[in-house]
From Swiss-Prot:
Family annotation (PANTHER family): GDP-MAN:MAN(3)GLCNAC(2)-PP-DOL ALPHA-1,2-MANNOSYLTRANSFERASE
InterPro entries listed in its UniProt record: ALG11 (IPR038013), ALG11_N (IPR031814), Glyco_trans_1 (IPR001296)
Domain of life: Eukaryota
Pathway it works in: Protein modification; protein glycosylation
Segments on the Lumenal face: 1-12
Intramembrane segments: 241-261, 462-482
Gene Ontology biological process terms in this record: dolichol-linked oligosaccharide biosynthetic process
Pfam families: ALG11_N, Glycos_transf_1
Family to which this protein belongs: Belongs to the glycosyltransferase group 1 family.
Name assigned to this protein: GDP-Man:Man(3)GlcNAc(2)-PP-Dol alpha-1,2-mannosyltransferase
Transmembrane segments annotated in the record for this chain: 13-33
Assigned EC number: 2.4.1.131
């Protein structure tokens, strides 16, 4: 017991010392501490060139053994300087040797010219764009945004170098780039891409934080951001995955522009409203505690956003939320994600609707995609009208939980709702080419998720010429299935049957459903209306939808818009550097 008290007293004393010291530093020495931290991160040791020259003169012991230099905690600043000076920046990844730096054989051959280029007082003109994306090898829509942004950044100038911070330590940079080329068709200059592998990615994984997940991942992202900055401090910080709580630390330590591409807010006003609208909210201490937790978290989220220089969002819905939460930023814009619509759009060879009488649902098998709502609506529609329409449900399954969810849907459809098996088919983990075939031969595409921030499946429906039946919220409503003038090739403010690109529905199960203000039909009613469309009406809607998504969501459009972000970022960087000099 005595030792326990001694431990507690020691802990309290240490805590007091830390708090007092922190206050003193905050009042008297914050600027100096920040300056010293920046110098530690961004400036190599004074004699680092001498050490590298010695290693160059010493050369490799044999052809198989690489020339390594070790600068301990200062390795990040030295690595940065070496890749800025190198003829092949990609050689300075930490993939194989961790904190030790492998001198490229090409730079060894350059000898003195390489050593001269290491001078910290020389401006190489190169700019390091650090893309923070810990799951860069995942192969999803977020990764497509990352790699198309990387491709555009590199094409914008030969002086642009990309540093990709990833936690995919189970693979190599070469394999990642091979996967990117195979999945997305991106043409990348691999010699100007440097992979920095982060060893602490587990701290941002949800399984690490079974409780207080938001808070845990926020703290984990701070650790991961600091690790990235220590391993190789960039000139520009580009977060393309959505880890905002590291921004203050990156800004304080590196004093560099921070650029974000936000797919959806970490916490939103909708989340708070959804909680407050629950019937049991007023009498539930648990829900009150959760509400308070989210409110505090949103305040922290707002604070983190104040360090952002340019915020890019993927949709109007996300823009509205980010613009409200990060109102201090002042530079929030929309760049729609690259959806490769130019590869999906096929022009009709004749004026006939020759597609199968079937509807397709493309959505991951998760409850929030509301497959059950679609099944019930489809069942009622078929029973009331006797229609022979077929429904296909396609989606990926991430694990056993998702596979169990599919079994529950099959039980609901075939047993409870008695939908004939010839009228409904579940297709899990469908290959992309097979999915494209279903899209090209079907007539209707359905999306039932409430407040889907964007909705890439809806873009694929429209690009493939399907008649879209989507929930009237967020991305599908505000950005994708919008009134379109096919002659002027532009979006219109008001919709009518003459400029329609699809249909919308609402449902009583919507968290924000209000019977009095409901202006949209139910999905069941929409099935009936869509089923009664003439071939001429279907062709007109299909053609307008294809033109709309080809104009707004092509890879080319994304590249043009991202190139402007790169230009603005370089201007910001030059302004910041000039301010430092003054």
């Amino acid at each position: 017991m005595e030792s326990c008290w001694l431990t507690m007293e020691s802990y309290q004393a240490a805590l007091v010392v830390c708090i007092v010291s922190g206050l003193i530093l905050a009042v008297a020495g914050y600027g100096n501490v920040r300056r010293l931290a920046c110098e530690f991160l961004l400036k190599p040791p004074k004699r680092f060139r001498d050490d590298i020259c010695e290693a160059l003169l010493r050369g490799p012991e044999n052809d198989q053994k690489p020339v390594l230099v070790d600068f301990g905690w200062r390795h990040g600043a030295v690595r940065r300087q070496m890749l800025l000076a190198s003829a092949k920046a990609s050689a300075y990844s930490n993939e194989r040797h961790g904190s030790k730096i492998h001198i490229s054989p090409d730079d060894i051959a350059r000898g003195r010219s390489f050593a001269d280029a290491l001078d910290v007082h020389r401006r190489s003109g190169r700019i390091l764009f650090g893309f923070f994306h810990p799951f860069c090898n995942a192969g999803g829509g977020g990764e497509k945004v990352l790699w198309k942004a990387v491709e555009t950044t590199l094409k914008q100038s030969l002086n642009n170098i990309v540093v990709v911070y990833t936690g995919d330590c189970d693979t190599t940079g070469a394999r990642i780039l091979s996967n990117v080329e195979h999945r997305f068709g991106s043409q990348l200059d691999s010699e100007r891409i440097v992979f920095i592998f982060l060893r602490h990615r587990k701290w941002v994984e949800s399984r690490t934080w079974p409780r207080m997940t938001l808070l845990g991942q926020a703290l984990g992202s701070i650790v991961l951001s600091i690790e990235a900055a220590l391993c190789c401090p960039p000139d520009v910080w580009c977060d393309t995955m959505g880890y905002p709580f590291g921004y203050p630390f990156v800004s304080w330590l590196c004093r560099i522009p921070i650029i974000t591409y936000t797919h959806y807010p970490v916490v939103s006003i909708d989340m708070l409203d959804k909680l407050r609208m629950m019937p049991e909210f007023r009498n539930s201490p648990t829900l009150w505690a959760k509400f308070l937790y989210w409110r505090i978290f949103m305040r922290c989220y707002t604070f983190a956003g104040s360090f952002v220089d340019l915020a890019v969002t993927n949709s109007t819905w996300t823009y509205n939320h980010i613009n409200a939460i990060w109102s201090r930023t002042g530079n929030v814009s929309i760049i729609y994600p690259p959806c490769s619509t130019e590869n999906l759009v096929i022009e009709n060879a004749h004026d006939m609707w020759d597609r199968k009488h079937q509807a397709v649902v493309i959505a991951q098998f998760r409850p929030e995609k509301r497959h059950a709502l679609i099944l019930r609506s489809f069942s009622n529609f078929v029973k009331k009208t006797g229609s022979n329409m077929k429904l296909l449900m396609l989606g990926s399954t991430r694990g056993q939980e998702d596979r169990d969810y599919v079994k529950k849907l099959e039980q609901l459809a075939y047993s409870e709702l008695a939908i004939p098996k010839e009228s409904l088919e579940f297709i899990t983990d469908c290959k992309y080419e097979k999915m494209k075939k279903y899209l090209q031969e079907s007539s209707f595409g359905i999306n039932a998720m409430w407040n889907e921030h964007f909705g890439i499946a809806v873009v694929e429906y429209a690009a493939s010429g399907l008649i879209t039946l989507a929930h009237a919220s967020a991305g599908p409503l505000l950005d994708i299935i919008v009134p379109w003038d096919i002659e002027g090739d532009k979006q219109l403010e008001r919709g009518s049957d003459k400029n329609r690109t699809g249909f919308f529905f609402k449902d009583r199960s919507d968290p924000d459903f209000c019977k009095i203000t409901a202006e949209f039909p139910t999905l069941e009613e929409l099935f009936v209306r869509a089923d009664q469309l003439t071939d001429e009406e279907r062709l007109a809607i299909s053609q307008r939808a294809k033109r709309c998504v080809l104009h707004k969501f092509s890879d080319l459009k994304f590249s043009e818009d991202w190139a402007q972000v790169v230009d603005r970022t370089i201007q910001l960087l030059h302004t910041l550097r000039n301010d430092k000099v003054e």
